[in-house]
Amino acid sequence: MKKYKSEFIPEFKKNYLSPVYWFTWFVLGMIAGISMFPPSFRDPVLAKIGRWVGRLSRKARRRATINLSLCFPEKSDTEREIIVDNMFATALQSIVMMAELAIRGPEKFQKRVFWKGLEILEEIRHNNRNVIFLVPHGWSVDIPAMLLAAQGEKMAAMFHQQRNPVIDYVWNSVRRKFGGRLHSREDGIKPFIQSVRQGYWGYYLPDQDHGPEYSEFADFFATYKATLPIIGRLMNISQAMIIPLFPVYDEKKHFLTIEVRPPMDACIASADNKMIARQMNKTVEILVGSHPEQYIWVLKLLKTRKSNEADPYP
């Protein structure tokens, strides 16, 4: 990655063509090729492949199962297994959908997209307000930002670099296909804040586990998690509205609904860190609860526990 003043821009390197990465390029080529087929044809096929891959990915499946058992203890083992299967199906469908958007562009793609809460975006544009979208970790998480960038909005987001440099290069190139800025989490949050203050629409994912030092333990579904209560600070420093957003893909209708919810400003403006953390988790619950298969449950979301509790992912 090549570093510029306040952003990272993907940079191709010759060693990406070495034999060690040939299989990666083959898989990426397959994804690009499959994205050219109509969703009505490819989605059922991708669902079967995704569920099959999910059965083989034992470690990832185990993490997802642990997360779901803690968050939804009222569900049966069978119900949770169905969610995990559907999650892996959604994952592959979303990756291919992102490739389709990057290759074919947004014109036809947008015909299969519905913005629920579009009036909120229009009000932001009308008032020329700074905004940070609070976006739970869904499989289609990059697509709304790409669509907004394609509409001419300046977007800024933070990202984690992938272990495979070819995947990292391609993925971040796709994210920037229609413009916008990417900020590495390794550089801290200041470059992201700077972009928001410059009028970029921020894109913040709130649900990663950052450890106990700066986090607050707050209720999360039926359990709790260590949540970094940073959005209050981001709102104040960036003078930005905090707008929840979450994409949901319907594999049967082949339609993406992007839900935009009213600003969180009123409920966090005077709240302490513990209340802010709870409001963040509550927002994730509202957006994800009715569509759990859309969420990336394979993350170690609940790794940080209270002092008397063991790591749930031994």
UniProtKB/Swiss-Prot annotation:
Record EC number: 2.3.1.243
Any one annotated GO CC term: plasma membrane
Keywords linked to the UniProt accession: Acyltransferase, Cell inner membrane, Cell membrane, Lipopolysaccharide biosynthesis, Membrane, Plasmid, Transferase, Transmembrane, Transmembrane helix
Pathway named in the protein's UniProt entry: Glycolipid biosynthesis; KDO(2)-lipid A biosynthesis; KDO(2)-lipid A from CMP-3-deoxy-D-manno-octulosonate and lipid IV(A): step 4/4; Bacterial outer membrane biogenesis; lipopolysaccharide biosynthesis
Origin: domain of life: Bacteria
Transmembrane segments: 17-37
Coiled-coil segments on the chain, per record: none
InterPro entries: LipA_acyltrans, Lipid_A_MsbB
Molecular function per GO: acyltransferase activity, transferring groups other than amino-acyl groups
Function: Catalyzes the transfer of an acyl chain from an acyl-[acyl-carrier-protein] (ACP) to a Kdo(2)-(acyl)-lipid IV(A) to form a Kdo(2)-lipid A.
Family under the similarity heading: Belongs to the LpxL/LpxM/LpxP family. LpxM subfamily.
HAMAP family with a match to the protein in the record: Lipid_A_LpxM
Record's protein name: Lipid A biosynthesis acyltransferase 2
Organism: Shigella flexneri
